[in-house]
């Protein structure tokens, strides 16, 4: 999923 990749590249985005 895109969100998973976003969290991987941007930990801040995960939160």
Curated annotation (Swiss-Prot):
Principal location listed in the UniProt entry: secreted
Keywords for this protein: Neuropeptide, Pyrrolidone carboxylic acid, Secreted
GO cellular component labels: extracellular region
Domain of life: Eukaryota
Localisation per UniProt entry: Secreted
GO BP terms: negative regulation of juvenile hormone biosynthetic process; neuropeptide signaling pathway
Modified residues (Pyrrolidone carboxylic acid): 1
GO terms of molecular function: neuropeptide hormone activity
Role: Strongly inhibits juvenile hormone biosynthesis in vitro by the corpora allata from fifth-stadium larvae and adult females.
Family, per entry: Belongs to the allatostatin family.
Record protein name field: Allatostatin
Top-level taxonomy: Eukaryota, Metazoa, Ecdysozoa, Arthropoda, Hexapoda
């Amino acid at each position: 999923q895109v969100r998973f990749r976003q969290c991987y590249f941007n930990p801040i985005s995960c939160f």
